[in-house]
A protein has these predicted regions:
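N-terminal intrinsically disordered/low-complexity leader segments
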Residues: 1-12, 120
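N-terminal helix-turn-helix DNA-binding core of bacterial DNA-binding proteins
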Residues: 11-57, 84, 92, 115
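Short, solvent-exposed amphipathic helices
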Residues: 19, 93-111
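Basic amphipathic alpha-helical segments that dock to polyanions
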Residues: 58, 62-65
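Glycine-centered, phosphate/nucleic-acid-interacting loop/turn motifs that mediate DNA/RNA or nucleotide
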Residues: 69
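Short beta-strand "wing" residues that participate in macromolecule-binding interfaces
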Residues: 72-73
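Basic, amphipathic "hinge/linker" alpha-helix immediately C-terminal to the N-terminal HTH DNA-binding motif
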Residues: 77-101
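Short, charged recognition helix plus adjacent turn
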Residues: 111-120
């Protein structure tokens, strides 16, 4: 993989890392994508699984992800209306990013645990 130099990457709108960061940079966005990696979810399911997210913020993030073609929304003609969210084909590609973050987070947690034990 070719890496651009940081000076070019930060100012270039076509920088792949910047494009990805623009999608996942907002609070809760990465966790919403993580929840959708396993499949379709209703709004209420997402709300329950993302403890402490407000309905307003969840709605905003889902709209942003839909506008960026990461998430697809399907509304069913029921009373009350049922809405499901799922990752689009390109959205599903973010699973590798989420898995890399999970791996890195696990390393950090283990490292912090090791440092804590060593200081005792």
């Amino acid at each position: 993989m070719d890496w651009e130099s940081p000076s070019n990457a930060t100012c270039c709108a076509e920088c792949p890392v910047r494009v990805t960061a623009d999608i996942i940079e907002h609070k809760w966005t990465t966790l919403i994508v993580r929840e959708l990696v396993s499949g379709k979810k209703r709004f209420s399911e997402l709300e329950r699984s993302l403890v402490s997210i407000s309905p307003k913020v969840l709605s905003e993030r889902l709209k942003e992800l839909e506008a960026k073609r990461i998430v697809c929304r399907t509304v069913f003609p029921t009373v009350p209306p049922t809405t499901e969210y799922e990752l689009t084909a390109i959205g599903k590609e973010l699973e590798t990013v989420i898995r890399a973050m999970q791996y890195f987070g696990t390393l950090l947690l283990k490292s912090a645990e090791s440092l804590e034990q060593a200081s005792k």
